[in-house]
Design a protein with these regions (language model features):
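Beta-strand-turn-beta hairpins that frame and shape the catalytic cleft
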Residues: 2-11
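Core catalytic region of metal-dependent phosphoesterases/phosphodiesterases
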Residues: 14, 19-131
Length: 131
């Protein structure tokens, strides 16, 4: 790969958003910054969603209810993550950003752990549900 001597490369890097808990004004600022800066690369450091419904800590001291009671909350969490990523992706598309990196944070691993416990619902794995 040839080196681009003297060429400035721009990247926007974002940390934990924990949607739906994310600050909507901050997300608005991020999307505007993407469209103004027009970075070459976008890097998401993970923890896209709070994913409370997937958390192993949620039922640590109490009995876990049947799966049919958990799934509606899981769906809500996944939808919140998708909405956030769609909002950011829309700005990345407007800025013509082609290089995107996603690092899976600890909260983003929780859906994968949930699927490990319930392998018959693989659609909830993070990379399938939110990407």
């Amino acid at each position: 790969m040839p080196k681009d001597k003297g060429v400035v490369k721009r990247a926007i890097v974002t940390p934990d958003k924990h949607f739906p808990l994310a600050d909507k004004k901050a997300i608005g600022c991020l999307t505007k910054a993407i469209e103004i800066v027009k970075p070459d690369t976008y890097v998401d450091l993970g923890d896209v969603g709070e994913f409370h419904a997937f958390s192993a800590w949620r039922f640590k001291r109490k009995k876990k209810p049947p799966l049919e009671y958990i799934i509606p909350r899981v769906d809500k969490d996944v939808e919140a993550g998708i909405q956030l990523l769609d909002t950011i992706d829309e700005s990345l598309d407007k800025a013509n950003v082609k290089i995107k990196h996603m690092i899976q944070g600890n909260h983003d691993v929780w859906p994968d752990m949930f699927v490990d416990q319930h392998p018959y619902i693989p659609q909830y794995k993070f990379d399938k549900a939110c990407m």
